[in-house]
Design a protein with these regions (language model features):
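Structural core segment of the AMP-binding/adenylate-forming
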Residues: 144-195
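A short N-terminal helical cap/helix-turn-helix that marks the beginning
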Residues: 28, 36-50, 66-87
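N-terminal amphipathic, basic-rich helices that act as targeting or association modules
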Residues: 1-60
């Protein structure tokens, strides 16, 4: 944050940003200026232009960076190397670690499988999965493919899952057949039949 404050003080000297409080004040009072600068400064990979920052009004009518297109997976997977990108800790299996290089390879593999299944940009994919590394890989592959993601934890009631997924009409469903909670194996196969 100190580096960004220094950047802002040089780029916008008339805003007198010198510390956290003045940065916060600037970001609220001049939010369009702040967000436009932050988008470029942050190094987020995007296509388009950072102007305008905001269009429309009201909760449903407002568009944030309407001329910007970005891909979540592209931004998260741009880091290379063997440092840990993803760690999974579970009571049901050994702890897992996945490097950035391995994560990119796994996401690419799943993305290719999605294309082989006929998934196209804008298609919807749902997941009935817990918070495990495989879920992260699936959501990144979905994003990389340009598809839309929705998920529910397997501890949701069946009707709640059906209600959510019916709204988006997914073309593909990622799921688990069970999970472990407090040492107890929870079988999800009957829920899957209903889904």
């Amino acid at each position: 944050m100190a580096r960004y404050i220094e950047h802002v003080s040089q780029q916008f000297p008339d805003r007198h940003v010198t510390d956290y409080d003045s940065l916060h004040h600037w970001s609220v009072e001049h939010f369009e200026e702040f967000w436009k600068d932050w988008l470029v400064y942050s190094g987020v990979i995007f296509e388009g232009t950072e102007s305008p920052v905001l269009t429309g009004s009201g909760l449903r009518g407002t568009r944030f960076f309407p001329e910007v297109r970005l891909n979540f997976a592209e931004n998260l997977l741009r880091i290379a190397g063997n440092t840990t990108a993803l760690a999974g800790i579970s009571e049901a299996r050994d702890d897992q670690e996945c490097s950035f290089d391995d994560l990119r390879m796994l996401v690419g593999t799943v993305q290719r499988q999605l294309h082989e299944q006929g998934i196209e940009i804008g298609d919807r994919i749902a997941a009935f999965m817990p918070n495990i590394p495989e879920t992260v890989i699936a959501v990144l592959a979905t994003s990389a493919a340009g598809a839309i993601w929705s998920s529910c934890s397997p501890d949701f009631g069946t009707q709640s899952v059906v209600d959510r997924f019916e709204q988006i009409e997914p073309k593909l469903l990622f799921c688990v057949n069970g999970y472990v909670h407090n040492g107890q194996v929870i079988d999800c196969r009957s829920k899957l039949v209903e889904l």
